[in-house]
């Protein structure tokens, strides 16, 4: 933001706080490495190092030298007595003066400072006081208050010198804030166009894109179609940042990268964030950017690696942050990489967040698995217009045959905005064929075999069950009438579609891990062919 709008209006310092437990969390390793590598000099982190955690002393589980670790990552490290306010002030001034790297202030503190028992025994630095009230640990709250110079009869009385200090600081801050706003107003008058853009960015409103004008190459993988859209967004959405966990050329976020350049230390004029192999850290950093405001954040990796991101997905959903998650290589068709890289259960896991409501009563996440290149454009339209919750786009590695269109494929694909729609149909259909993603084109091929025998078919694409379930009962009934015979095809667990096919239906899906083989071989072996669709539907209708 500073690189785009200047230091006059974007000169914040970001303060972070971390504990002994936080230092041990995996995400602190990724975030620490990235912040140091990029030289984020406006980041100051306080580390409360008291050597006590919930179940043990820190030394029992962690022997690392934290200062050396952060210095190795490129941080400035300041060590102080964390219980001394003068040392804290001095460290803050030093950290604020740093202009080339983030700063870690290690405050060596005393856990439960001043805590005593009724017999005046010391309760400082005890594991027992970490996760429970002092009294439950055996200390005396009244005697502790006395020991700290307070009055047990009036424990919440603010000392006069403290009240005076805070009142003085409040007045100082009022002046500082007024000065900041004055500078911002002068800047806005001098740069009205930039100020208008800034207001738009922080409004949280979706950017205006001519989605119908996006031209897609026919019969491509949906990851390639996503790259096409990202290329447009890179040139039309100035406040968008896209990240990848060392897979930009595979997850095709390079469609965005090719129109900009990656962040590097000292140059943040680009809009691409190379996170390295750190899916969880990447996702959390994107959430942080979203929480800051003014930024549209998106990040990409293989779908199977969404497993590493689950805590971040939950937090994005809980905090209602509209981060865009781009997951490619969506099924067993990853092929030769084998079962370690072939997602099976991941779609079912992620779609649970479509069923979970946030505190505003909305689906906590929008999950989209488009069926062809044009539906991918529409999926991105939905993602960018969703400014209320996170969005997931689940995309194919392999090419997909475009779905048939009566007239204008884009206009027909816009029906995906309701979560499910009819791709094509025969009057008085005998069976409904249902799928998302690349399986829809397989249904189209299977339908041709069924129609050759006089079986009437309706084909339905369901990129988002959660979105479909949010439509009126009338619309849902118009797509999937009650009592219909429905066949579902999914490259994930059958549970992905079982709620849609109902008691008169049947789902063909995977109930085991994948295998290492070319994807066309796996299609045959695992039954994802037109012939098997024909066989399964004939059996259903028998």
Short names for language-model regions:
Residues 157, 161-163:
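Low-complexity, polybasic segments enriched for Lys interleaved with small residues
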Residues 22-23, 51, 111, 249, ...:
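Short, glycine/acidic-enriched loop or turn micro-motifs at the edges of active sites
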